[in-house]
């Protein structure tokens, strides 16, 4: 198979802040942002299709396997991925929400969106806990700019979100 095409990472604490601030259920916003990821990755795919099939800028990707005759690179065999970062900090923010949330149900909700996308277009959608330290730092800066008391890890100068789905042992929140 071809592998992962692209992924977009959701800033879970920022979504949580928005939910608390606007008194909107967190899952309503999470679903909304998952749909934005869907639309974004579908748009990116359409642009790559143009590069491959209309502009022929990467013809080497269209070479055929000598045994099967199928293209070595096939956009239909790629995985399209919803990434997430800051589950720990999102749970801290959501302690002030009107509803109760836990980490497991948030990840299950992301998975539910993924399954819906799989059925919608037949492509291979997945969910990953984004492993990008630079994203964890950038998201923390964004969150602190908009919400000065937003929970982060590290120091004021070198802040970051807890990577992916990790929750520190010292956190009183529970993943389940």
Regions found by a protein language model. Give the residues of each.
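Conserved catalytic cores of very large enzyme subunits
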Residues: 1-76, 97-100, 104-176
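Short, hydrophobic beta-strand segments
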Residues: 12, 89-94
């Amino acid at each position: 198979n071809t592998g992962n095409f692209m992924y977009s990472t959701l800033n879970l604490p920022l979504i949580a802040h928005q939910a608390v601030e606007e008194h909107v259920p967190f899952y309503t916003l999470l679903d909304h942002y998952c749909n934005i990821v869907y639309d974004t990755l579908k748009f990116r795919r359409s642009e790559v299709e143009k590069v491959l099939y209309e502009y022929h800028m990467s013809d080497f990707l269209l070479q055929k396997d000598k045994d099967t005759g199928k293209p070595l690179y096939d956009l239909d065999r790629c995985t399209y991925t919803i990434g997430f970062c800051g589950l720990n900090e999102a749970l801290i923010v959501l302690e002030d929400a009107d509803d109760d949330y836990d980490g497991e149900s948030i990840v299950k909700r992301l998975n539910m969106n993924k399954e819906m996308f799989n059925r919608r277009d037949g492509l291979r959608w997945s969910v990953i806990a984004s492993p990008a330290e630079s994203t964890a730092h950038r998201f923390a800066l964004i969150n602190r700019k908009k919400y000065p008391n937003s929970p982060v890890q590290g120091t004021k100068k070198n802040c970051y979100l807890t990577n992916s789905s990790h929750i520190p042992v010292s956190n009183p929140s529970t993943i389940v």
